[in-house]
Amino acid sequence: MRLIIVSGRSGSGKSTALDVLEDHGYYCIDNLPAGLLPELAERALIHTELAQPLVAVSIDARNLPSHLSRFPELLEEVRSRHIQCDVLYLDADEETLLKRFSETRRRHPLSSANRSLAEAIHDETQLLGPIVDLADLKVNTTNLNLYQLRDTIKLRLLNQPEPGTAFLVESFGFKRGMPVDADLVFDVRCLPNPYWKPELRAQSGLDAPVAEYLAAQPDVEEMFQDISSYLLKWLPRFAASNRAYVTIAIGCTGGHHRSVYLTERLGQVLQKSLKNVQVRHRDLS
């Protein structure tokens, strides 16, 4: 059995995550009382007609505070039944959450006549502390649109061919901000930039002319060797420490040339030594 627990602050994309999981065969329950987690897992194991039952539930601030405070022990009880259980925590910065509620005119579940939206978001953050501390995968949706969020859920949660640590090597551009959910960040802006070659500007690190240009630069090769040596040495230690997800982010200025080229090469090297290695280019349209 596989159980995915979806949590996060209101407005961060939990409904979208459940929709994606439901589309991929998961039996989904929104706003499950946390105290029912062990019972749900037990019943799913006993009564399911599926050889590999797939269940997803959302648990958030609509729960009783006493149930949320018990989340660590409830999660431990579920996992003691040898159930594959992943906790997905979605979030966004406060300004984005405020904007989303303003645009949709939805009411925050904790807001009231005596509690402003900002105060409700603050209180929600405190209530969800026991869950965020135990999250296996944290996804910040501040800069993600609906389609990007759906793709991220599918990539990180549904495309794992084997159990174990899921590694994501991701390129990005600093001008759009660092990925806040990255575990390791490498800044490669010091390398020669193909952007300043007019014939290469419109291409990306996936295109042969850009790759050939970068491959001929000694500094690029030295950077690649240093990063790959570091990752090959230390990523197995992350896996040995029972980390479910590890994100490695490679950043250049725009996220189109240097970071893309290095991310592709690093992904190829890591896929030869590690299981569950995925590659993503955040800022390529």
UniProtKB/Swiss-Prot annotation:
Keyword Cell membrane: no
Signal peptide: none
Family matches, as Gene3D superfamilies: P-loop containing nucleotide triphosphate hydrolases
GO molecular function, a single term: ATP binding
Domain of life: Bacteria
Binding site for ATP: 8-15
Record: residues binding GTP: 60-63
Key words of the record: ATP-binding, GTP-binding, Nucleotide-binding
Family label: Belongs to the RapZ-like family.
Function: Displays ATPase and GTPase activities.
Protein's recorded name: Nucleotide-binding protein PFL_0912
Species annotation: Pseudomonas fluorescens (strain ATCC BAA-477 / NRRL B-23932 / Pf-5)
